[in-house]
C-alpha cells in the first residue's frame, strides 16, 4: 500500500518536469519571436508601400442583395518594413488604411510571416504561405481594436508581391478574400 503514494509522487514530479521543460521551450519561443520582431523594426531590409486591391465576398456564403450593397474596391494605402531571414522567408511589420465592405475606413496593423518558395529556374519568381497576426479597427465595431490571426499567401516577381488573406466567417458575415500589392523599396 505504500507503493501507491510513491507512484503518485513520481507521477507528479514527472508532470512538473514536463511543465518546466514546456515552459522553458515556450519562453525560448517568445524570446526568439521578440528578437525577430525587433530586428525587423530596427534593421529592415526594405521599406514597403502597400496598395489594397481587392475585397471579394464569397458568393456561396452571401445573399445577392447583401453583395450588391458591399464595396469590393478597397482604395487606400499602407506601409511597412520587411526582412528576409537566413532561410529566405519573408517577415514584415505593416499598417494599412482602406475602405472596407461598408465603404468606411478600416485600419489593420500587424506582423506577417511567409515561408518563401522559388519553384522556377527564374529566382525572381516566388510564392509564399504563412500567417499574419495583428489588430484591426472598423467603424461597425466602434473602432475598438480587434485581434486577428489570419492565413497569408503571396505570389511575386522581383520586388513586387500580390499578398492575400481569407477572413473566415458565417453566412452573410466574414468569408471575405482580401488582397493588396506590396512593393519592396
Swiss-Prot record:
Homodimer. Belongs to the lipid A palmitoyltransferase family. Its main location: membrane. This is Lipid A acyltransferase PagP. A lipid is attached at residue 15 (S-diacylglycerol cysteine). Keywords: Acyltransferase, Cell outer membrane, Lipoprotein, Membrane, Palmitate, Signal, Transferase. It is found in: Cell outer membrane. The gene is pagP. GO terms for molecular function: acyltransferase activity. One of its GO terms (cellular component) is cell outer membrane. One of its GO terms (biological process) is lipid A biosynthetic process. Its EC number is 2.3.1.251. It comes from Erwinia sp. (strain Ejp617). Transfers a fatty acid residue from the sn-1 position of a phospholipid to the N-linked hydroxyfatty acid chain on the proximal unit of lipid A or its precursors. It catalyses: a lipid A + a 1,2-diacyl-sn-glycero-3-phosphocholine = a hepta-acyl lipid A + a 2-acyl-sn-glycero-3-phosphocholine; a lipid IVA + a 1,2-diacyl-sn-glycero-3-phosphocholine = a lipid IVB + a 2-acyl-sn-glycero-3-phosphocholine; a lipid IIA + a 1,2-diacyl-sn-glycero-3-phosphocholine = a lipid IIB + a 2-acyl-sn-glycero-3-phosphocholine. Pfam families: PagP (PF07017). The active site is at residues 57, 100-101. Residues 1-14 form the signal peptide. It comes from the Bacteria. The record marks 66 as: Role in lipopolysaccharide recognition.
Amino acid at each position: 500500500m505504500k507503493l501507491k503514494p510513491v507512484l503518485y509522487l513520481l507521477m507528479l514530479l514527472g508532470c512538473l518536469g514536463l511543465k518546466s521543460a514546456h515552459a522553458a521551450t515556450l519562453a525560448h519561443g517568445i524570446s526568439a519571436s521578440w528578437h525577430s520582431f525587433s530586428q525587423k523594426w530596427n534593421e529592415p531590409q526594405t521599406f514597403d508601400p502597400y496598395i489594397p486591391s481587392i475585397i471579394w465576398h464569397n458568393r456561396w456564403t452571401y445573399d445577392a442583395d447583401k453583395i450588391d450593397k458591399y464595396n469590393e474596391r478597397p482604395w487606400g494605402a499602407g506601409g511597412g518594413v520587411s526582412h528576409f531571414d537566413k532561410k529566405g522567408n519573408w517577415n514584415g511589420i505593416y499598417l494599412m488604411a482602406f475602405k472596407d465592405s461598408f465603404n468606411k475606413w478600416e485600419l489593420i496593423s500587424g506582423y506577417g510571416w511567409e515561408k518563401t518558395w522559388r519553384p522556377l529556374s527564374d529566382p525572381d519568381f516566388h510564392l509564399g504561405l504563412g500567417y499574419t497576426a495583428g489588430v484591426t479597427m472598423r467603424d461597425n465595431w466602434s473602432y475598438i481594436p480587434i485581434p486577428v490571426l489570419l492565413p497569408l499567401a503571396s505570389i511575386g516577381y522581383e520586388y513586387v508581391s500580390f499578398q492575400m488573406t481569407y477572413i473566415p466567417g458565417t453566412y452573410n458575415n466574414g468569408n471575405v478574400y482580401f488582397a493588396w500589392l506590396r512593393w519592396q523599396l
